[in-house]
Structures are given as structure tokens and as C-alpha cells.
């Protein structure tokens, strides 16, 4: 039987099922490099403050480096009987340097140790995530540059509303992902904090130097309150909340890619690299990757709700419930990083069917607003113009024609304000080009949006 580091107070050992139920090493293994990093900073501080001798600190540090080397070579076997990542690492350190390993835990608790590990882990994830989001935003901007003059229907209620530029549609997602970027960047602020030195909850009687470990671990600052340091999981909840918003945006884009790639729309074709086939229908090309991203949004939402539910009833400070804070964080990190990479690949390699997109703007009544605006610009109150055009649309539907096919004679019977220039106004390209209000779909407006985005991406 492996001796528990906390076993002195107990007369009996855990039974096997209970031991397995309470062990977290099955999912904590990815914290190993961060646990060792935290321990190296801690032992350096212990040595420099004289809490242990310089010789002891050097021996422990060298032992930790050897454990780190074994970890990198895949020579570490994680054992359930050692419970968690901390005790697994300390056991290997003990194998390297003997009983001196026990001095590493001076002025430290697993409570501040695990919090430190998670702050370090999430800082690393956020760094990778911000890079991935920047890459996706760049891809969207580059795609937009190529499609400023590509027309498509804009939708409300999934019905044709007004003609727009495809670039305008894409740049709407650029804005969403930029907000995601900003949220995760702010998330770094609350993650970049050092809990090490808070010990179990009340600090320590040893003359530790928390500023030193803060600098060694490259944290922005140390927690100001030891109880908050060991019980705070807001930084993870922020991450999960931000991840949920990101997955919602990715899911919305996936839904549109699924629609656009359907036979009925045929606006885009996704690359074979991001599609699969059917085991029974030879003709099928299924947009599975877009469907998977859409589906995986649910698990990220679930991870957020799971931790919120865990946290809502916890008194200060540490409770074993907090063991449930990791798997959802790990899963969400894996999910969003992979989803971002797959989305970037899908957008980079998809084929845009410009002809079908533009044709779709001509075989509808999405130019009805142009006619109403045309009449309003000539002095007719917009509400009256709206009523007249609505009646005309109904007449056209009954006749099986579109507004651009109505004769000038019939137009002038509707209103003497209408002249021959109305046919130019009714063209989709004209309709789009005229909408150059700030943020509008006009070609000049979109170019300004793209230029602004390029400046933002250079920061």
C-alpha cells in the first residue's frame, strides 16, 4: 500500500472503490508540466528566503528537472494510488532525491498548488486561443477582400430581405470573432494572477516572498487575499462563458455554411478535406465538420453550466467539489481550439459560387425597399410608399413577374413620381452600391470596414 502524504491522522486506508472515485490523476495529467513549473519557482523562493538551505533548494530543483525530463520522454507512469498530479510528481521527486523531497511542500498546500497549476495552464491555452482567433479573423478579412463585389441575398426570418455584398456578410462574423478575441484578452487579466503562497487558506507563518514567485512564474500580480486565491474559479468560469459565446458564433456560421452548401442554395462548395460520404448513397458529400462544430457547441455550454452549478453552493474556501473544475475546462479548451482550426480550414478552402449568389438576388423581391426608398426620396411619405410597393409586390406575385419586369406605364399608373431611372434603382448591384452609410453594405463602406479590420489585426 502506498503511504498517503496526509495519512498520519488515519487508522484505516481508503477502500479501492473510494480511492478510485476520489482520484483525479486520470484527467489531471496534462497539468504535470505546470505543476513542475510551479514547484521550481516555489523551491527557488524557499532557498532565497532561507526557509530551506541553498544546497537543499538546488538538490530539489535538480530533482524536479530530472522528473521534468522523464515527463518529456514519456517515462512517467501516473498512479491512481497517488491521487492527484501533485502527489504523483512528488513521489517521482522522492525517487530521485529521497526524503529531502518532503521539504518542497514547506509553506505550500495542494490548495494553492492546484490553483497555480490551473492559472498556468489556462494562461497557456489563452495564448494559443488568441493566436487561433487572430488567424481566423485574418482568413475572414482575406476572403472578404476577394468578395466585396460578390452579391447575395441578405436574410431576415430566413427570407430574402435585401441584396448585400458577400463580404458584408463575412465581415459581420469578423466583428463577432473580434468581440470574442476581446473577451478572451480580458480573461487573461484575471488568469494572470498568482495564488501560490496562499497555502491552505490563511497564508503561512514562513517568511515567503510571493512577489518572487509571481515574477518567476511570469504572473502579472499575486492574489491580494489568501482565501480568494484558493477558492476563486471565476477565471475558469469566464473562460467557459467566453468559450460558449465563441462556439455560438462558430455554430451560427456553420449553420449558414450548411445551408449555402445545400443543393437548394448552391452558394458554396466545401472542400473534400472537410466533407465525408455516405455508406449507402454514392452521390453524397456531407458537410460533417460544420455539423460537428455546430453540435459541439452543446458540450461547451454544458461545461459552463456544470461549473456554475458546482460553484453556486460552495462556502469558502476549498471544497472537494472543486475537483470538478478541470475536466470541463480541458474539454472546452480542446473543443474550441480544434473548432477554430477546422473553421479556418473550411473557409480557406471553400469555393464560392458567385453566379448563383447574384442570381438569387434577381429572382426575388429584395429590391422592394429600393422602390419604397425611391418614392420616399421624391417626397412621398415612407409609410405611403411602403403601402404602394407592398400592393405592387402582391400584384407581381399573382402575375408571376418581378419588380424589374413591371412596365413603366404600370409604374406610372401606380405613381407619377416614378420615372425611367427606376430600373437602374431596382438592380441589385445598384441597390448594394448605394448603401454606404457607416457600417452599411455599400462597396465603399465594406472597403472601409476591411481597412479598419486590417489595422486592428496589426495591433
UniProtKB/Swiss-Prot annotation:
- GO molecular function annotations of the record: argininosuccinate lyase activity
Q: Which GO terms describe its biological process?
A: arginine biosynthetic process via ornithine; L-arginine biosynthetic process
Q: Which GO terms describe its cellular component?
A: cytosol
Q: Does the keyword Repeat apply?
A: no
The annotated pathway is: Amino-acid biosynthesis; L-arginine biosynthesis; L-arginine from L-ornithine and carbamoyl phosphate: step 3/3
Record's PROSITE patterns? FUMARATE_LYASES
Q: Where in the cell is it found?
A: Cytoplasm
Against Pfam families, the record matches this protein to: ASL_C2, Lyase_1
State the reactions this protein catalyses: 2-(N(omega)-L-arginino)succinate = fumarate + L-arginine
E.C. number:
4.3.2.1
Q: What class of enzyme is it?
A: lyase
Q: Which UniProt keywords apply?
A: Amino-acid biosynthesis, Arginine biosynthesis, Cytoplasm, Lyase
Protein family according to the UniProt entry: Belongs to the lyase 1 family. Argininosuccinate lyase subfamily.
Q: What is this protein called?
A: Argininosuccinate lyase
Tell me what gene encodes this: argH
Amino acid at each position: 500500500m502506498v503511504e498517503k502524504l496526509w495519512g498520519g491522522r488515519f487508522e484505516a486506508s481508503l477502500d479501492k472503490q473510494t480511492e478510485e472515485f476520489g482520484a483525479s490523476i486520470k484527467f489531471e495529467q496534462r497539468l504535470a508540466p505546470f505543476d513542475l513549473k510551479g514547484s521550481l519557482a516555489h523551491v527557488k523562493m524557499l532557498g532565497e528566503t532561507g526557509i530551506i538551505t541553498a544546497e537543499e533548494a538546488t538538490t530539489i530543483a535538480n530533482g524536479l528537472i530530472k522528473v521534468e525530463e522523464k515527463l518529456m520522454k514519456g517515462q512517467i507512469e501516473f498512479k491512481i494510488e497517488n491521487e492527484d498530479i501533485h502527489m504523483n510528481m512528488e513521489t517521482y521527486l522522492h525517487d530521485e532525491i529521497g526524503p529531502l523531497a518532503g521539504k518542497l511542500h514547506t509553506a505550500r498546500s495542494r490548495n494553492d498548488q492546484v490553483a497555480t497549476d490551473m492559472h498556468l495552464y489556462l494562461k497557456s491555452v489563452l495564448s494559443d486561443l488568441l493566436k487561433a482567433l487572430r488567424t481566423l479573423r485574418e482568413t475572414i478579412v482575406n476572403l472578404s477582400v476577394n468578395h466585396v463585389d460578390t452579391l447575395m441575398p441578405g436574410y431576415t426570418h430566413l427570407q430574402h430581405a435585401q441584396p448585400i455584398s458577400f463580404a458584408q456578410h463575412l465581415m459581420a462574423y469578423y466583428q463577432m470573432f473580434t468581440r470574442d478575441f476581446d473577451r478572451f484578452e480580458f480573461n487573461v487579466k484575471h488568469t494572470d494572477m498568482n495564488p501560490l503562497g496562499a497555502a491552505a487558506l490563511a497564508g503561512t507563518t514562513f517568511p515567503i516572498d510571493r512577489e518572487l514567485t509571481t515574477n518567476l512564474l511570469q504572473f502579472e500580480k499575486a492574489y491580494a487575499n489568501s482565501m480568494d486565491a484558493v477558492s476563486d474559479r471565476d477565471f475558469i468560469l469566464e473562460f467557459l462563458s467566453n468559450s460558449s459565446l465563441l462556439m455560438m458564433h462558430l455554430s451560427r456560421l456553420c449553420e449558414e455554411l450548411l445551408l449555402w452548401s445545400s443543393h437548394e442554395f448552391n452558394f458554396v462548395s466545401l472542400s473534400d478535406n472537410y466533407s465525408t460520404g455516405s455508406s449507402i448513397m454514392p452521390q453524397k458529400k456531407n458537410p460533417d465538420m460544420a455539423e460537428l462544430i455546430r453540435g459541439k457547441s452543446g458540450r461547451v455550454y454544458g461545461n459552463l453550466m456544470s461549473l456554475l452549478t458546482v460553484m453556486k453552493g460552495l462556502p469558502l474556501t476549498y471544497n472537494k467539489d472543486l475537483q470538478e473544475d478541470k475536466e470541463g475546462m480541458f474539454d472546452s479548451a480542446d473543443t474550441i481550439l480544434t473548432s477554430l482550426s477546422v473553421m479556418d480550414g473550411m473557409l480557406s478552402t471553400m469555393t464560392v459560387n458567385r453566379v448563383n449568389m447574384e442570381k438569387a438576388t434577381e429572382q426575388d423581391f429584395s429590391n422592394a425597399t429600393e422602390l419604397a426608398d425611391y418614392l420616399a426620396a421624391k417626397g412621398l411619405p415612407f409609410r405611403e410608399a411602403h403601402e404602394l410597393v407592398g400592393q405592387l409586390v402582391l400584384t407581381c406575385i399573382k402575375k408571376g413577374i418581378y419588380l424589374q419586369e413591371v412596365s413603366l406605364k404600370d409604374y406610372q399608373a401606380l405613381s407619377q413620381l416614378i420615372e425611367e431611372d427606376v430600373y437602374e434603382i431596382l438592380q441589385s448591384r445598384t441597390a448594394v452600391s448605394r448603401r454606404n452609410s457607416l457600417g452599411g453594405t455599400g462597396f465603399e463602406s465594406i472597403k472601409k470596414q476591411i481597412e479598419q479590420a486590417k489595422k486592428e489585426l496589426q495591433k
